[in-house]
Amino acid sequence: FLMILPFLILCFLFSYFPLHGWIYALYDYKAPLKLSQCQFVGLKWFKTLFSNKTQVMQLIQVMKNTFAMSLLGIATSFLPVLFAVFLNEIKCKWFKNLVQTLTTLPNFISWTLVYSIAFCLFSTTGMFNTVMQNLGVISEPLKILDSGRHVWLQMILWSTWKGLGWGAIMYLAAIAGIDQEMYDAAKVDGAGRFQIIKNITIPSIMPTYFVMLMLSVANFLNNGMDQYFVFQNAFNKSTIQVLDLYVYNIGMTGRSLSLATAIGILKS
């Protein structure tokens, strides 16, 4: 018991103790007042979620965005696997290290900096529009960032670019753990590179992939908000707003911290 006691304490402090904040969903809380100074409203905010037509429509759109981004994330979860396999096939050590470093580096860049890069490249005055206009390909700048069209595609592309190299590290470790005698035996039998990948490498890392896939499914509603927050603007707000960002917008910049708490409870 003493060995697991530190784990139990940390689990309580970080997983259960913060739940006392759920009580705000039962009050009409107005910052910076104390909770005792606010009116007790019971289940009012929970009823508002399903009785207010505007609120219901917003919530439906938010859930649609959340489900879409989660499904796209799951659908592209195989990309780090393929990248790890191809990276493992690079025989030139220095080039392999260079590629791995360059593809892992974006993971350590904040989403604020990623948006700055996107703005420099794809804003109406950015490099892409400037080059296309100078070449005569387009007459008017394309509103890539200032539009609600293709937002889901943009988000998954930026997310893939940022996390591809980092996501491949675990699969590279799994590949390193494969028994080399299997490769030697396959080469003796005359198997080619693609046959070895198909019959040895990929099947051997599938258990790792399915574990990561199950973790992704378990966090289906947890898209985070950093990426969507920095890319959010008045033009794409309706299509980029996922559940975590919606809770933030309502609680910090919207109508009510209490309503945001109620939505957070339903998410849990």
Predicted regions and their residues:
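A structural signal for multi-pass alpha-helical bundles of membrane permease subunits
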Residues: 1-268
